[in-house]
Amino acid sequence: QQPQGGRIINNGSVSAHVPRPGSAPYTSTKHAITGLTRSISLDGRKFNIACSQIDIGNAGTEMTKRMSEGIIQASGDIKKEPIMDVSHVAKAVYDIAELPLNTNIQFMTIMASSMPYIGRG
C-alpha cells in the first residue's frame, strides 16, 4: 500500500500486571493486548507502522466509578481507591500520536499516583 506508515495505540490495563480478585476474563484480555502490541510492532516494521500500548489504571470513567466508592482488594477488604482525570490519558495518547514514526513509546503505564498498584494485595 502506498503511502505506508502509521501508528497504532492499544488500550491496555494495569490489571494485566496486577489483577484484581475475580477479574480473570478482563485480566486475560488485557494481557492478550500486550502480545498483540508486540506482534504488531514486529510485523509492522516493514510497513513503517509503530505500535504502542498504554496500560491505564483508575482513570475516571463510568467503568471505574465504583473504585472511588469501594472495591474488593486481594485481602478481601473493600477499600476506596483514588481516581485520576481521564483527560490525562487523552493527553498521553495525543503525545504518543504526535511522535514521528521513527520514534516509539512501546509501553506506558498511566495511573492515579496513589492507587494500589505497586504492592497491590
Q: Where do the language-model regions lie?
A:
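A short helix-coil junction within the Rossmann-fold of NAD(P)-dependent oxidoreductases
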Residues: 1-5
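Residue(s) in the substrate-gating loop at a strand-loop-helix junction
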Residues: 13
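Active-site loop immediately N-terminal to the catalytic Tyr-X3-Lys motif
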Residues: 18-24, 81
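Short beta-loop-alpha junction of Rossmann-like oxidoreductase domains
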Residues: 22, 55-68, 121
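Catalytic tyrosine of NAD(P)H-dependent dehydrogenase/reductases that use a Tyr as the general acid/base
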Residues: 26, 34
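Active-site helix of classical SDR
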Residues: 29
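Alpha-helical segment proximal to the catalytic Tyr-Lys
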Residues: 42-45
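C-terminal helical subdomain
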Residues: 53-54, 73-118
